[in-house]
Amino acid sequence: ILQNCLVLRSFYRREKGGLIKKIKFNILSRIHKELLISVPFSKKGRLVGFCKDINLGYCSCHTVAFAAIQIAYSLKYARIICSGLDLTGSCSRFYDEDKNPMPSELTRDLFKILPFFRFMRENIEDINIYNLSDDTAIQYDIIPYMKISEIEEPCVYEKIS
C-alpha cells in the first residue's frame, strides 16, 4: 500500500500536471478499474478522481473528508453519513487548540475541492452518502442533506459488490 499511495501522492501535489503525468494516470486508471480518474487534455483542466479500493491509495483533494469517504466506500459501508462536512471555513477545526488555531484554507481551495465531489457523484453510482450539515458548500444534489432524526430510520440496502 505504501508504494501505491506514493503513486497517488503526485495526484495531490499539482492537479494540472504535465503530459507525462497525465499519461501515467490514464494508464493507471486503465490498469486498475477501481481507480477512477478524469484526465483532462487541456492545460487548464484539473485531474479529479476517486479510488474505490483503498489498497491502491486514495485521491486527495485538499480535504480529509474526501479521503475518509473513499476509505468508507472501500470498506463497503452501506451508508456513509458525513457530520461537519460544511467546507465553508466558518467553523474552527475540531482539533484546534484555543490559543493557537490553524487558519482554514477551505475558501481558497474550494474551487479545487468541489470538482472531486462532483466527480464522485457522477461516477460512483452505488455510493449511498449523506451530509448532516445544513450549511454547506457542497450542493445537496451532490451529497444529499439528512436530518439527524433520519439516521435511525430503517432503510433497505442492497449489497455492494
Set out the residue ranges of the language-model regions.
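Metal-ion/cofactor- or nucleotide/acyl-coenzyme-handling active-site neighborhoods
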Residues: 1-161
